[in-house]
């Protein structure tokens, strides 16, 4: 009987260090903000220790996004990431630094890797040139969403995309995003940000399947 108490404590610790989400949820976990959203289907999001998370999705989910990071975000953070991005070239998915600002309402992406669809092809968008950061070239495109879901309900708003060329690819990935470089370049093109809401290093899937296990710092 003397061994029951330490065994119970160990079991509670193991369970508490990992949490699987099946429904939309935001919050804080191990010092990081997290966000998980899906519009349908069986996608799951697992909160691991520290800045680590895992996402698992199939074609039963139309669209989902999840990640860990900070709330509020800022314009000068350097974000490091590493882990496994388990998709193939036919899967519609992004691996990106992702966030929102208000006043103006902006949804932004720094896309480090993607599958079958590049956001540089968004319809009705405008190409905003390219710049170099961290030894890579990023192509920039501004897109417009009309009457679309946002962090303040259904709205019309601009999206900013910085897309890494060449992309990181699939499988084991690692790198860093110096967000200040992107903010400065966007501003030089007349693409301002507003007051930061959340800022996460996210995995997103659209009508696809895959698995990601990513650590953010």
UniProtKB/Swiss-Prot annotation:
Glycosites: 56, 80
One of the Pfam families matching this protein, by short name: Glyco_hydro_11
Listed InterPro entries: ConA-like_dom_sf, GH11/12, GH11_AS_1, GH11_AS_2, GH11_dom, Glyco_hydro_11
Active-site feature positions: 107 (nucleophile), 204 (proton donor)
Known pathway: Glycan degradation; xylan degradation
Signal peptide limits: 1-17
Tissue distribution of the protein: Expressed in larval carcasses and gut, and adult gut.
Compartments, record wording: Secreted
UniProt-recorded Gene Ontology molecular function terms: endo-1,4-beta-xylanase activity
GO biological process: digestion; xylan catabolic process
Main location: secreted
SUPFAM superfamilies, alphabetized: Concanavalin A-like lectins/glucanases
GO cellular component term, pick one: extracellular region
UniProt-listed Enzyme Commission number(s): 3.2.1.8
Reactions it catalyzes: Endohydrolysis of (1->4)-beta-D-xylosidic linkages in xylans
Protein name, per record: Endo-1,4-beta-xylanase
Lineage, opening ranks: Eukaryota, Metazoa, Ecdysozoa, Arthropoda, Hexapoda
